UniProtKB/Swiss-Prot annotation:
Gene: RNA14
Role of this protein: Component of the cleavage factor IA (CFIA) complex, which is involved in the endonucleolytic cleavage during polyadenylation-dependent pre-mRNA 3'-end formation.
HAT repeat segments: 67-99, 101-135, 149-181, 192-225, 262-298, 307-339, 513-548
Species per Swiss-Prot/TrEMBL record: Eremothecium gossypii (strain ATCC 10895 / CBS 109.51 / FGSC 9923 / NRRL Y-1056) (Yeast)
Protein known as: mRNA 3'-end-processing protein RNA14
GO molecular function, one term: mRNA binding
Gene3D superfamilies cross-referenced by the UniProt entry: 1.25.40.1040, 6.10.250.1660
Length: 661
C-alpha cells in the first residue's frame, strides 16, 4: 500500500482498549500492521499525533534510505504546512536539496520561506541562502558582477536579520572575511572596499552582539593600517557607541543566561533530544524568552519606532520557533503584531497547537468578529478532535487518574465554550446540537457541560423545566460527585424549586463518599433552610450533620447559617480569631491558638483575653527579598506545587511547637 492511501475500517482491530463503548475517536496506531511495515506504522503515528515533528523526521529518513525523493518532498511539505515559521525545518530541507544539487528546488524553497506571508527570519536560514548565492556567484570567475551580487546578499541578510541577532558572530566574520579577500585592481576599487569595510564596522560596533571586543581591536588595528592620520578621528567618533553596545550586550547576556537556542540544521543532526515536542516545554525557558522580549520593548538602544518594532518582531519570531508548543508565546506574538495580522498569526499558532484552548478561543473571537461562522465551527471541531484523541491515548496508556481527569475537563471546557459561542452567533438550536453531541461521550466528559447547558437554557427561556431535566439527566453519570450536586443545588435554589432541593439532598447524601464535598452540601442546605424554610427543619438537619461529622465545631455551623451574600460576617465581626489572616476559617485545636495570636489576642495570667495593638510589621530581610525577585511567576507552573490549605492543616494537626521556657 502506498503512503498516500488511507486504510479502510477492516484494517482496524475489532477489539482494542479504545473500543469499549466509548464515543472518542479510534486510535490509528491500533490498526493491524505488519511489524516490518515501517512506513505505514509511522504514518499511523503521525495521524494520531500530527504535531510530533520527530515522527516526520523519522519518516523522511526512512524515505532517504529508500531513495524515494518524491515522498521525501511530500513529507517536508506537510511539515512546512504545519510549522511554516519553524525556520530550522526549512534549513534542513534546503540543505538536503543542496546535497541533491537541485538548484530549481532550492530557489523555489528560498523564495517561499524568505518572502511573502511565510517569511522566516533566522540567522541559520539566511546563512544557507548566503551560501547558495556565493556558490552560484563565484567572484573569481564572475568578477565584479558576481561580487556585486554577493555584496547585495550580505547587505540583505544584515538588514533583515544580523543587526537584530546577538549571536550573529559567524555572519559578521564571514562578511568581513569576504571583503578582506577582495583584491582590488584599481585605486577606485580599493577606495570602495575601504568605504564598505568602514561602514560595516560602524554598523557592527554599535550593536549588542557577541565578541564585540575582538571586533573593536580588529577595527582599530585596521584603521591604523589604512591611514594613521585619520585613524584617531574615526576611532574617537565610534568609541562611545561601542562602549554602550558592549554594556548592553553584557546586560542582555546576563538576562538570557541559560537560554537554549540549539536546533538542528541538517537531517542527520535531528534527534529526539534537540527537536521540539508537543506538550513539552520548559517554563524556565519561557520565562527567559518573555524577559528578552520585554528587554527589547524597553528600547535600550533608543531606536526609532519602526526599527524597534522590527527588532521586537525578530525576537518574537525566534521565541515561537524555539517554544512553538507554548501557547503563551504565540498569544503574546499575536497581540504584538498589527491588528490586521492577529488572525493570521493565530491561524499558524493553532496549526502547531491544535488542542490549545487559549489559542482556539482567541482565534474564534476574531473569526466571530469577521463573521466567518463556518471557519469558527471548524476551529472548535478541530480543537475538540485533538483533545479527544489525546484523551483516548491517555485512557489506553496512563494509570494516572488525575491526568485523565484534567484532560476530561479540558475536553468539557472546549465543548462548553463551543456551545455558548454557537448560542451567541447562530442561536439556541445550534448550541443544543453541540450539547447533544457532547453528552454522547458520557463518562468521558465532566459535569460542567450539564451545569453550563442548564443555565444557558434557563437564561434563554426563563423556563425551569428544560434545565431541570438536563441536570436530572446528568445525575445518571455524576450522582456520586459532590461538586455536581453542589452546582445542581445552586441552580435549584436560584429558581426556587424547594421540593426538588429536598429531594436531591435526600437522594444524594448516602452516595457521596468525599466527606469534604458532603459537608459542603449539608451546610448549603442548612443555610437554605435557615433563610427560606423553618427553624425546626434547620435543627433537624444540624442534628444529622453532627451525627455524620461529630468533630465539627458547633459555632462554625451556627455562624455559617448567618452568612450574608456568601460572607460569614458573624465570624468576621464578632469572632475574628476564628479566621486566619487571609479570612479563611480556622476550625479547632492548635490552629485556633495560632489564629488568636495572629489576630493580636493574648491571654493574661487569669485566663482572660485581651487584644494587642499590632505595631509596625518587622521589615522583611533583604535575603528574602532577593530570593523572591528570582523566583518564577506563578503562571509558569501548570499545577499547584504546594497546597497552602493542606500545609496549614498538616502543621496544625501533626506539628507541635514546644512551649518557650
Amino acid at each position: 500500500m502506498s503512503g498516500n492511501e488511507t486504510p479502510d475500517a477492516g484494517t482496524v482491530k475489532s477489539v482494542s482498549p479504545s473500543s469499549g463503548g466509548s464515543s472518542l475517536p479510534a486510535r490509528p496506531t491500533l490498526r493491524e500492521r505488519d511489524p516490518n511495515d515501517i512506513e505505514n506504522r509511522l504514518r499511523d503515528q503521525i495521524e494520531e499525533d500530527p504535531t510530533q515533528i520527530l515522527l516526520y523526521i523519522e519518516l523522511i529518513k526512512y524515505y532517504v534510505g529508500k531513495q524515494q525523493v518524491a515522498e521525501i518532498r511530500e513529507v517536508f511539505g506537510q511539515l512546512h504546512e504545519l510549522f511554516p515559521l519553524e525556520s530550522f525545518l526549512w534549513t534542513i530541507h534546503l540543505n538536503w536539496e543542496l546535497e541533491q544539487e537541485e538548484s530549481g528546488q532550492v530557489e523555489t524553497l528560498l523564495a517561499k520561506c524568505l518572502s511573502g506571508e511565510l517569511m522566516n527570519n533566522d540567522i541559520y536560514l539566511w546563512s544557507t541562502y548566503l551560501g547558495y548565492v556565493r556558490r552560484k556567484n563565484n567572484t573569481v570567475t564572475g568578477g565584479e558582477e558576481a561580487r556585486g551580487t554577493v555584496l547585495k546578499a550580505y547587505e540583505l541578510v544584515m538588514e533583515k536579520c544580523a543587526v537584530f541577532e546577538p549571536r550573529s558572530m559567524q555572519f559578521w566574520q564571514d562578511y568581513l572575511q569576504f571583503l578582506e579577500q577582495w583584491k582590488p585592481v584599481s585605486k577606485w576599487e580599493e577606495q570602495s572596499r575601504v568605504e564598505i569595510l568602514r561602514k560595516l564596522y560602524k554598523r557592527l560596533l554599535c550593536l549588542p552582539v557577541e565578541s564585540l571586543e575582538r571586533y573593536w581591536e580588529k577595527y582599530t588595528q585596521w584603521e591604523q593600517e589604512v591611514n594613521q592620520l585619520t585613524a584617531r578621528k574615526f576611532i574617537g567618533e565610534l568609541s562611545a557607541s561601542y562602549m554602550n553596545a558592549r554594556s548592553l550586550y553584557q546586560e542582555w547576556s546576563n538576562l538570557t543566561k541559560g537560554l537554549r537556542r540549539s536546533l538542528p540544521t541538517k537531517l542527520n543532526q535531528a534527534t529526539q533530544q534537540n527537536l521540539p515536542a508537543p506538550g513539552q516545554y520548559d517554563e524556565y525557558q519561557l520565562q527567559i524568552w518573555t524577559k528578552w522580549i520585554q528587554w527589547e520593548l524597553d528600547n535600550k538602544l533608543d531606536l526609532p519606532e519602526v526599527v524597534l518594532r522590527q527588532r521586537v518582531e525578530y525576537v518574537h519570531r525566534q521565541a515561537v520557533q524555539h517554544m512553538c508548543f507554548a501557547p503563551e508565546i504565540w498569544y503574546n506574538y499575536a497581540m504584538f503584531v498589527d491588528e490586521n495580522e492577529h488572525e493570521k498569526v493565530l491561524e499558524i499558532a493553532v496549526r502547531c497547537n491544535p488542542g490549545s484552548l487559549s489559542l482556539t478561543f482567541k482565534l474564534a473571537e476574531y473569526l466571530e468578529l469577521n463573521n466567518k461562522i463556518e471557519a469558527l465551527e471548524e476551529r472548535f471541531q478541530h480543537c475538540i478532535a485533538r483533545i479527544s484523541m489525546e484523551l483516548q491515548v491517555m485512557n489506553d496508556t496512563t494509570m494516572d487518574p488525575d491526568k485523565i481527569l484534567r484532560q476530561t475537563r479540558k475536553l468539557t471546557f472546549a465543548y462548553c465554550v463551543y456551545m455558548t459561542t454557537m448560542k451567541r452567533v447562530t442561536g439556541l438550536s445550534a448550541a443544543r446540537k453541540v450539547f447533544s453531541k457532547c453528552r454522547k461521550l458520557k463518562k468521558d466528559i465532566s459535569y460542567e457541560i450539564y451545569v453550563e447547558n442548564a443555565y444557558m437554557e434557563y437564561y434563554n427561556n426563563s423556563d425551569v423545566t428544560t434545565p431541570c431535566r438536563v441536570l436530572e439527566f446528568g445525575l445518571k453519570y455524576f450522582q456520586d460527585n459532590g461538586n455536581y450536586i453542589n452546582k445542581y443545588l445552586d441552580f435549584l435554589i436560584l429558581v426556587k424549586q424547594d421540593a426538588q432541593i429536598k429531594s436531591l439532598f435526600e437522594s444524594c447524601i448516602d452516595k457521596i463518599y468525599n466527606l469534604d464535598q458532603l459537608k459542603e452540601i449539608y451546610k448549603k442546605v442548612i443555610n437554605y433552610e435557615s433563610k427560606f424554610g423553618n427553624l425546626n427543619n434547620v435543627y433537624e438537619l444540624e442534628r444529622r450533620f453532627f451525627e455524620k461529622f461529630p468533630e465539627a465545631e458547633k459555632i462554625e455551623v451556627f455562624t455559617d447559617r448567618y452568612q450574608l451574600q456568601g460572607e460569614n460576617l458573624l465570624k468576621r465581626l464578632e469572632f475574628p480569631y476564628l479566621m486566619d489572616e487571609y479570612g479563611i476559617p480556622v476550625l479547632s485545636g492548635y490552629a485556633v491558638k495560632r489564629s488568636l495570636h495572629s489576630a493580636g489576642i493574648v491571654f493574661d495570667d487569669n485566663g482572660s483575653s485581651k487584644r494587642q495593638r499590632q505595631e509596625q510589621t518587622e521589615a522583611v530581610p533583604m535575603e528574602i527579598i532577593e530570593l523572591l525577585k528570582v523566583l518564577p511567576k506563578r503562571q509558569y507552573f501548570k499545577t499547584i506545587v504546594l497546597d497552602p490549605h493542606k500545609l496549614a492543616d498538616f502543621l496544625s494537626d501533626k506539628v507541635t511547637i514546644p512551649p518557650c521556657d
